Amino acid sequence: LESIKKNSTFDHQIIPHVNIGEDGTKEFLKLENIEYTYTKYNSGICEGMNKASKKASFDYILYAHDDFYFCPGWDTEFKNEVDKIKHNNFYLSGTMIGSTGKDSLDCGTNIDNFNEKKLLENYKKLNFYDFQGSTWAPHLIHKDIWNKVGGFSEEYYPGTGSDPDLNMKLWKENIRIFKGLGKSLVFHFGSVVTRRNNNNSKIKTESGNRGNKIFLLKWGISIKFFKKFYLKSDLPYVSELSEPKKNINYLFSLVLCKINYLYLRYFYKFK
């Protein structure tokens, strides 16, 4: 919240969703005069985001995690891109800076050891580019489009797999701009919920988890297939997307998806 307030060019309506809220979060938000939504239970990302989005007063909805630090100029990059596009049929995302991996910056793993000074002195030195097929937060969608597709699909509780599912729903609405902005940066501490539940089969990465199974049964293809052949994820951005080329690689991978689909549907009996 602090980073949004001090590092934003524009004024934003901030609407957190509070799960359970026994740690004083509700009281803090009330003191800060920040509007929020609330459930007495852990609603997960999808239900929480859907509830919060209903309170949105502006034309665009930005979904973000609670463990992001927004770097200066993050919203200017979004605004400039929206102005270039000149219509509402898009899905834009920022770029996450991690503490490990390629183009990383070790600025801490939590709020207690966060080195804000190091981040602000070095984030512009990182070599990020605009990329194709983003499925990650922070993402920006026009509110009319968000409402048209029904926001996040809540069957993906607690949330893993819901991002590419949203992308697929947008694809079905003939949206072909899925662009990650290399200069709109947030520092990501990493999911605290995932770390706490790293043995929970419901909370894992996209490949092989419950969310991937739901996606496969819902759409007939895997998340990996969708990101590779449709979204062309992580390639440098060139232009809006078109229908995938149905070459041998595509057809072979599609057959594997259908075999996995049949296994899940009729033998594994996934619920």
Protein language model regions, located:
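A short, conserved alpha-helix in the catalytic core of glycosyltransferases
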Residues: 78, 132-150, 155-185
